[in-house]
Amino acid sequence: MAQPPSGQPTASPTPAIRRARTADIRGIRALVAPLAKRRVLVSKEAVTYYEAVHEFRVAEVDGRIVGCGALHVMWEDLAEVRTLAVAPDQLGTGLGGRILEELVEDARALGVSRVFCLTFETRFFERHGFVAIEGQAVTPEVYAELLRSYDEGVAEFLDLERVKPNTLGNTRMLRAL
């Protein structure tokens, strides 16, 4: 907490959550980079973030991006929460949960009935209604269609061999809406 001249602590400003803009990509990448280095999140090229900017929500305090998350629609009834991250000084404040719930509301507004994630943070997602799943969450017909996608996240969802190094240790989780 900041200390005003009186010596009394003041509350930090509550981050505002909004849709991302192209100008936010540098801030998103700066937030994600240390997590990608530790292999908590998948590293992505800048162009990938620009292509997906419309999928992102960001949390901002005083012009600084302190949180982000994306919702990627995979099929008529299924979307994935991706790249959910908060700044170290925001951990434990509930910001990650706020961003997640905004993404879930986006999914509902789109008519999606299930939200999926690949994560190491199972307790966090369990607190938000996600449950661990085994096997495929789609029919064989949808699986065959998804195989045609060029998106690396879809390949991870399908558990394809070529992306195994990205997903080792991750838990597949699903939330019905």
Regions of interest found by a model, annotated:
Residues 84-91, 120:
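A short, internal acetyl-CoA/4′-phosphopantetheine-binding micro-motif in the GNAT/acyltransferase core
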Residues 30, 105, 123:
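Surface-exposed charge patches
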Residues 42-61, 67-86:
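A conserved beta-strand-loop-helix scaffold within acyl/acetyltransferase catalytic domains
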Residues 2-43, 60, 168-177:
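Short amphipathic alpha-helix that is part of the acyltransferase structural core
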Residues 92-105, 117:
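Conserved acetyl-CoA-binding loop-helix of GNAT-fold acetyltransferases
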